[in-house]
């Protein structure tokens, strides 16, 4: 097969390059959808367990059919993925270990069983453990789907395309049930949606997705595509539909950017895509507006300052003596460092809560009102009392 060459605005690509990116995009979208629900259910590690433990299913399927292209391999691998989930839950329900420990016990055992089966009984067969882990997208376009001599394109693209269509169809049919069972299993049962059925349905889709992407991209990239985009989206929004779209967007971007990074530095395509996914998540983790590390640290710093301000205002409210309201009192009696005292005073002046005359601090009318409302909020915890303060003060935003 002689590759065709395409040129778009001086960017020259051969047909295998386009097909590699299409396969990566389809895999990214197919992984992002179940990945969102796994992250929301705090089951991110289960995707790693499934991606490794399906190996025995593939090997057993090959022993039965002697055909690496048989659909039975996919079915048995998906079944092995479900068995993994059941085993993890059985161990977890004993109460002796937590979920992450149960996962750590189950998937290495199943994966090693698969490796031993290959080593002992399938040495002459193309079942490469390294390819299972890392995949090799560069070769995916050369495994073609041929029907009656007609070349229909890369087999991986068709397999993952079918998996993606099934995933999207199930998402549309059961979106409401998935949403309710994810956030409130009790309400789901009350409304007649079995959370157990939804749970194992999600696990089945996750298993089939992992199996479908297994040969093309490898276990490591599948896990990265399931978890990293969803985790990044989780830090950016609380809306489920937006989270799905953002997760898909991150996955597609990482697939394309990762391919061109690999092309630029002559490295593993799957490894480069996983690296880009890590960089994307790190960027969101640091700079997300509400949940990012920098935003959280800034908010905590502001809240500490505002707690100090509120403490100072309560002190002023309780003391009318000038010596108790003198600026020097901040350092001597409240035991604040000079920088902290200056920061608190500046915040109070900025919000017109205090005035300073001859280094004696007094509450303004607004300061008196603020202090009384804050006290009432502390006692009653009724949000309506401090609703108008939330725009100016981190302290009351929760």
Q: Where are the model-predicted features located?
A:
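Short, amphipathic alpha-helical interaction segments positioned at domain boundaries
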Residues: 365-398
